[in-house]
Design a protein with these regions (language model features):
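Nucleotide/phosphate-binding sheet-loop regions of phosphoryl- and nucleotidyl-transfer enzymes
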Residues: 1-275
Length: 275
């Protein structure tokens, strides 16, 4: 019996299935995360879906290879163990980010979805654990905005009739609420305001895109994964590849990683460093 092809590479607790030299398979980001994990740097646990999956996805009429979903579920279970939380669990929920990762850097050309796993069942526990209702509803409205834009509109191939996409329309809803309240900054919005916005956003998404924002964590996850693969052939990415001479057949990896938050308060932040 032939050995099943490995499509998912874990990094957690100072160990990694991959190596820093495996950029062709894991993409630059995935290879870097694997190497940092091996070096003992405190990297939040996650896993990388290989560039091979992207290649097979497009070869097979945008269908995933056999065994991928089982490998993702197996890797997620290991991430849950490493983080002491469970994806979709109503008591100790794990949230993840879903990011692209080509072997050569393509900054801003492909898609990202953050806060994946926030649902009506996990929000109460996140509020209880963080003791910060405002942060949780801010994360939730960001998820709705990002997911509607990246997954439900762009990846679905929906072209806005008036040229204004769903993200622009949701931003207008937020700006209108700020004007009504006399606020100057997004940070002026209260927990109640953000909860109200999340409800408004979901209604707007349903009205414009004719679909409900998903309340199932795994539907959110696979929507995000698919959107990253779709973004490899998005207009921006295709144009960038032509300019930079990046071959189409390289494909992108997908990195699913435990969330790190930069919006929990004035002493919280995230960023990108270049060396």
């Amino acid at each position: 019996m032939s050995k099943k092809k490995k499509y998912v590479y874990l990094f957690a607790n100072g160990k990694a299935d991959g190596k820093g030299t495996w950029k062709e398979l894991l993409g630059g980001k995935g290879a870097g995360l694997a190497e940092m994990s091996r070096l003992g740097i405190p990297v939040p646990a996650g896993f990388t879906i290989t560039t091979d999956v992207c290649t097979e996805y497009y070869k097979n009429s945008r269908k995933y290879p056999a065994g991928l979903k089982e490998q993702v579920a197996h890797a997620m279970a290991k991430v849950e163990k490493a983080m002491g939380a469970e994806f979709g669990d109503p008591k100790r929920p794990l949230l993840v980010s879903v990011r692209s990762g080509a072997r050569q850097s393509m900054p801003g050309m492909m898609e990202t979805v953050l806060n994946v796993g926030l649902t009506s069942k996990t929000i109460p526990a996140m509020i209880e654990r963080s003791r910060n209702e405002r942060f949780v509803y801010d994360a939730y409205r960001r998820l709705i905005m990002m997911y509607a834009d990246v997954v439900m509109e762009k990846a679905a191939g929906i072209e806005p009739a008036d040229g204004h996409g769903i993200r622009h329309q949701l931003e207008q809803e937020m700006d209108q609420l700020k004007r009504q309240k006399g606020y100057q900054f997004d940070t002026d919005l209260t927990a109640g305001d953000l909860k109200h916005l999340a409800d408004l956003f979901k209604k707007k998404v349903k009205a414009v895109l004719k679909k409900d924002f998903p309340d199932d964590p795994y539907e959110q996850l696979w929507g995000g994964i698919g959107a990253v693969f779709q973004s490899w052939n998005g207009k921006r990415a295709v144009s960038y590849r032509k300019i930079e001479g990046i071959p189409e057949e390289w494909g992108t990896a997908v990195n699913v990683q435990s969330m790190v938050f930069g919006n929990t308060g004035s002493r919280s932040g995230t960023g990108v460093a270049f060396t």
